[in-house]
A protein has these predicted regions:
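NAD(P)H-binding glycine-rich loop region in Rossmannoid oxidoreductase-like domains
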Residues: 34-41, 45-91, 99
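Active-site Tyr-X1-5-Lys
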Residues: 137-164
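Mid/C-terminal beta-alpha module of Rossmann-like enzyme folds, strongest
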Residues: 212-279, 296, 301, 309-330
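Substrate-positioning beta->alpha
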Residues: 147, 179-180, 197-217, 223-224
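NAD(P)-dependent short-chain dehydrogenase/reductase
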Residues: 158-165, 169-203
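Conserved Rossmann-fold NAD(P)-dependent oxidoreductase catalytic core, especially the SDR/UDP-sugar
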Residues: 88, 94-140
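N-terminal Rossmann NAD(P)H-binding glycine-rich loop of SDR-like oxidoreductase domains
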Residues: 3-23
Length: 330
């Protein structure tokens, strides 16, 4: 089976490509022109350069593929409002979906985000039945991902789009070249995390999400969403787990919500005045003390998503960052 993977050089995309190769599939990786694709070096794949916002280039890349796994996304959170976020997270999805229908591709696995559903407390974590509630934070990343998901589900109902949607939570793993979640690990390792907030989130191994995406080519139902979450930890627990896994001291100070919000307000103001991304914006300050917990029951039961122990995912991420020069030696 030949499968087109968008965002193939990103953290999740790099895991998806390797998972597909392990299963014996042919992979065509669609990457942006001129982009560093070092995470794909040495892999037996077909690389195609193309602009996802150009429908003809997308169709050309999709020719002769039986399935598409769309992992590319703009995860920018500053500025919190930016048309470029919508271009990647909504316009591109519309172009891909149209090409899937025109070329009669068998399966379109779209990677969304768990935040398209309302989270819950640990005792009652969010599920695929929950409404979208994160619009209150004013982040185009979350709003655009939810809007794209709604569009795809409408297209499935009205036009028979063969789409299955995967909704990952916060991912740890190798190939985190930005780094994204790896920044949290680097900060704890270097002792740069002064404290933690009262909220929490769901952490998952990127390799598990990749396995679920690959499984979705054969398993699961069209027009369904699957939350690919993992372990639900408050921030104190998460930082202690990272510190224990790496053998360093955990941050011990719990920062009050009012102080976090004040820091976020100052950060947003500084960001607007300086044009530089702040350490903490007001929307992210509000997110940081929310309980963002999710259930992975549906993805585990229907897609057979594995459940890697979180320390293993943390170590995998840290070791990759270390091997690639991101870790400051103590």
């Amino acid at each position: 089976v030949k499968i087109l993977v968008t965002g193939a050089d990103g953290m999740l995309g790099s895991h998806v490509v390797r998972e597909l190769l392990r299963r014996g599939d042919e992979v065509r990786a669609l990457v942006q022109p001129g982009r560093d694709t070092g995470t794909l070096d040495g892999l037996e794949i077909e690389r195609v350069e193309g602009d996802l916002l150009q429908p003809e280039q997308v169709k050309s890349a999709m020719e002769s593929c039986e399935a598409v796994i769309h992992t590319a996304a703009n995860t920018q959170i500053w500025p919190s409002r930016d048309r470029r976020i919508w271009a990647v997270n909504y316009d591109v999805v519309k172009i891909l979906a149209a090409a899937v229908l025109e070329l009669e591709v068998q399966t379109f696995v779209h990677v969304g985000t768990a935040t398209s559903f309302s989270p819950g407390p640990k005792e009652q974590p969010g599920t695929e039945e929950g409404p979208y509630t994160d619009g209150k934070y004013g982040l185009d990343y979350q709003d655009s991902k939810h809007a794209a998901q709604e569009m795809l589900l409408r297209m499935q109902q009205e036009q028979g789009l063969p789409v299955k949607i995967l909704n990952p939570s916060f991912m740890f793993g190798a190939y985190d070249s930005k780094p994204g979640a790896g920044q949290m690990i680097l900060s704890v390792y270097a002792g740069r995390t002064p404290g933690y907030t009262s909220g929490g989130k769901s952490y998952v191994a990127a390799r598990d999400v990749a396995a679920a995406a690959a499984n979705a080519l054969q398993r699961g139902e069209y027009g369904q969403c699957y939350i690919a979450a993992g372990e639900n930890l408050d921030y104190g627990e998460a930082f202690r787990l990272i510190a224990d896994t790496l053998g360093v001291k955990a941050p011990g100070l719990k920062i009050p919500n009012f102080l976090v919000d004040a820091m976020g307000l100052v950060g947003s103001l500084w960001g607007r005045l300086s044009g530089q991304p702040p350490f903490l914006s007001y929307p992210m300050a509000r997110v940081s003390h929310a309980d963002c917990y999710y259930s992975n029951r549906k993805a585990v039961q229907e897609l057979g998503m594995p459940q890697t122990d979180l320390p293993a995912a943390i170590l995998e991420c840290f070791n990759w960052l270390k091997e690639n020069g991101y870790v400051e030696e103590k």
